[in-house]
Amino acid sequence: MSAPTLDVESPLAASTSSLRAMNMVSSHTTVAKDEIYDLLGIGFGPAHLALSISLRESSEANETNFKAHFLEKRGHFAWHPALLLPGSQLQVSPLKDLVTLRDPASTYSFYNYLHSHGRLARYINKEQGVPSRREWTSYLAWAARRMNQAVSYGQDVISIEPLALASASPDAKQDTVAVRPASAQEADSLCLYQVRIRDESTGHIVNRYARNLSVAVGGVPKLPPAFQAAWDEQQRAPHSIPRLVHSGFYIPSMLKLEPELHKAASLRHPDAAAQLDDSSRLRLAVIGAGQSSTEMFMNLHSRFPSAIVTMIFRASALVPSDDTGFVNSAAFDPERTDEFWQASETQRRKWLQEFKRTNYSVVRTDLLNELHDAMYDKYEVQLPEELQDPTEKQAGRMEMRRCTEVVEVTPLDDGIQLTMRDNLRNAKLETIRFDAVFLGTGFIRSPSKMRFLEQLKPFYPALDAEWMSRDTIAEEDEVSKSIDVEDEEVIERRREMLRGITRDYRLVPASAMQSDAVRSGKSSPGSGSDASSTSSQQTLASENSTENLPEASLYVLGGNEATHGLSDSLLSIVAHRAGELTTSLLQRLPRTRRGTASSAATQPAASTVASAAKTSPTVSVTQTKARQAAQVVNDKLAALSGLHLDATS
């Protein structure tokens, strides 16, 4: 099978139009059609790596010459490199790799990686049922190397400008297309994105054009409120020694910080043979009670055995993660995404709260037991002095401050001062100086935090944090009570409008937000079917646009926990979702190109999605009946003016 066009675009060569259009489009400009990508993916972690493989293995993508490429800011592939600590284990089954849930026969599976490296039998003989994080990183890097032609590294996306057709009737026979800057008031005419990219090695800036964008760039550090000002101050001095370290930067930060801490320790205690007291020891704090906090806690004790390392958290105890079969199935199986999507907001919130124990502020049981046993043996079991190893007298300690909250953070020249409230002792306040503080407080994965999407905020309400935080419980609950098989298309439309995103991860444009019709299930005054036709263009899979340049779509991955479930940012779903995205992208090709492909999607991803559709009316309508149903939906919306969409209407 020949590879689709995504495999011939590396490295990104500066094309004629790219060099000609170094700045954002100020008026009309022309773009060569052969320079337009069907998809540009921003970020190249597991989510987009899985998608690139799915596209390569898709027969339909080959037949239609689907042109895709991915951009990664780092100079090479990496997966959570900041916490690649010795002994750290993967927290998910290795069968939830890049491909297996989409196509178990793919050569990009974890087990084929082991086989190709001649160690499948040795892996089977391992006692641990999951690979180390080190081995999983090696697997991902192996797959990424095989996809090298699909990605350009060292490419920083600066901004994205939405473009519209300059002519209402473009000439399909021309090799170029005329475009102009799009207006948020006419987002339904948005047909292209201009992506401005800086090459990190040369500083050169080029523009690329794409019909579809997919964003999967991970998250930004989530900081407790008390730490925000100190963090911001430190960020303004990027070349200084970091005393406040988030887990997302742990190993790179330690390259600077560790020598400084060892130097400070030797200055305080120049005589290595003398007895150490607490005033001479390094003091290090770890904030949080989850997996990353625990790993940093143990690693810091290993790096600085004579230091006092304190773990500070609000909970009563460290809690094990629930990775039992029933819970894993209920929270992370692929079909749960459909179940979650179709549920009301009230039900989705309950599920998120219920299944937090699988992923948030929890620790793998084996690591938890290892830590508990080490602390018990070291601090509870006392040997007679004559039997003690001489180094024990110099040893530091690990300690935990549970039920404790940090209320004030004061940066110092050589450390951080924390004021803490001890909720076990009548909210008593205590202030302690630490040489460094480490935050295992998680990440924020909202697309509203991505600066390069700033120009698109007027076009997509879901990019606005305030819009996303509005209360829609009543409207969502009304939708869930209104479900009628006959009107499933209408119900699906309302879900998309309320959430600002579709089931297949496309953001809903502002022009589709007919607020009266969306929020009450009514057509707005004077709207009728014409008003809702704009909505139908933007949602489901309908295309009321030119044959050669359908409407542009923005896919967002990893920031949709509230609408698609806990697995959205996790490895559990990447393979299956890659198949869904492949199907969605191919369905949105121009009609003239779709006609060149065989009628059936022959890749396993398509069959996987089709299988899911049998149990999900939403997926079935979205992926197989949307275009035929669009006009029917519009007629229904008009006919239902003034009526709620319930079974008795």
Swiss-Prot record:
NADP(+) binds at A289, G290, Q291, S292, R314, N359, Y360, S361. This is L-ornithine N(5)-monooxygenase. Keywords: FAD, Flavoprotein, Monooxygenase, NADP, Oxidoreductase. It comes from Mycosarcoma maydis. The keyword Cell inner membrane does not apply. The keyword Zinc does not apply. One of its GO terms (molecular function) is ornithine N5-monooxygenase activity. Pathway: Siderophore biosynthesis; ferrichrome biosynthesis. Homotetramer. Its EC number is 1.14.13.196. The gene is SID1.
